[in-house]
Swiss-Prot record:
The gene is upp. This is Uracil phosphoribosyltransferase. Pathway: Pyrimidine metabolism; UMP biosynthesis via salvage pathway; UMP from uracil: step 1/1. Catalyzes the conversion of uracil and 5-phospho-alpha-D-ribose 1-diphosphate (PRPP) to UMP and diphosphate. One of its GO terms (biological process) is UMP salvage. Disulfide bonds: none annotated. It comes from Thermococcus onnurineus (strain NA1). Uracil binds at I204, G209, D210, A211.
Amino acid sequence: MIRDERWEGVYSFEDSPFIMEILTELRDENTGPIAFRKGLVKLGRYMAYEITKTMETERIKIKTPLEETDGILIADRRNVVIITVLRAAIPLMEGLIKVLDHARVGIVSASRGKAPKFEIEMKYVKVPQITEKDTVIIADPMIATGSTLIKVLDEVKKYGKAKRYVIVGVLAAPEGISRIKEAHPDVEMFVAAIDRELNEKGYILPGLGDAGDRAFGAPIKV
């Protein structure tokens, strides 16, 4: 895990050969939807494991069949809310919840409009009550302009004040990270990699394309 010195609380996993191998497959234009979804699940699971290293633990006493001994409990793992940003984050959330299996789950449908305005439309919000003990994890694979996540954070914070707000993504652009940190300085961010820049259409370069379309197929207009 690498802390990026350009921002407070922003981390990437570019030092992990395993995560970089998964990311390489996700970037490859020849990777089909099934393998793409499986890759997102694997990333979510491994990144959740890494995030547990930042959670508070407590020592507990247990009894084995032979004697009493000390053990460890990851206390924060019992108080997690995962917010899934539809639709691309569904496989990522599936991986996260394999490790954070006590998590309550919220669903947000938010989509970004076209350049140059990139207006955000939020159609559906179902979020559980949030308490001061909770770590709120917002799953969204692509952190591009940051507009969607700013809007989601604005909405999620209406449901209660959390102990931590964490964004988990696959790729992020520096422009999006800066915008999110300016709007919500308290948020932490964990991504597989931080890419170079955005193009004129708001896509991350070198990126991996539209994560939702690659995972589930391109939608059609009727």
